[in-house]
């Protein structure tokens, strides 16, 4: 029978002080995807790695309230709060989609104090492609 030798003070797989470093991100790209049902705001660095994201649904809005301008404003403020703390000063904004939250999200981004290099609208527009959904009758 083998005798076990206990080492005093030994730590296996110990990770002392290996917390992930919060790096400074001076500039980035803010993507706003505004559909009729929800608004998703994603903040990336220049290389495209996601730093922060938020959506109206993740901010606590459920159902039809997710598509409102106020929900989009809350989602944008939520996503940007973390990157402002990491030192983001300049950003490019890329907006996609026809939703109601486009302008509200852009207003929240402008209010955050980040300098905007440009605002680009990349909403896909069909050149008479697929048939559009029928109009609602309420």
UniProtKB/Swiss-Prot annotation:
Reply yes or no: does the keyword Transmembrane apply.
Answer: no
State the GO CC annotations. Answer: chloroplast; ribonucleoprotein complex; ribosome
Gene Ontology terms for molecular function: rRNA binding; structural constituent of ribosome
Where would you find this protein in the cell? Plastid, Chloroplast
The record's listing under SUPFAM superfamilies reads: Translational machinery components (SSF53137)
**Skewed-composition ranges (Basic residues):** 9-21
Q: Chief location of this protein?
A: plastid
Region Disordered, annotated ranges: 1-21
**Alphabetized UniProt keyword annotations:** Chloroplast, Plastid, Ribonucleoprotein, Ribosomal protein, RNA-binding, rRNA-binding
Q: Name one GO biological process term.
A: translation
Subunit structure comment from the entry: Part of the 30S ribosomal subunit.
Q: Which NCBIfam families match?
A: PRK05309.1, uS11_bact
The record's comment on protein family reads: Belongs to the universal ribosomal protein uS11 family.
Q: What is this protein called?
A: Small ribosomal subunit protein uS11c
Organism whose genome encodes this protein: Cicer arietinum (Chickpea)
State the gene name recorded for this protein.
rps11
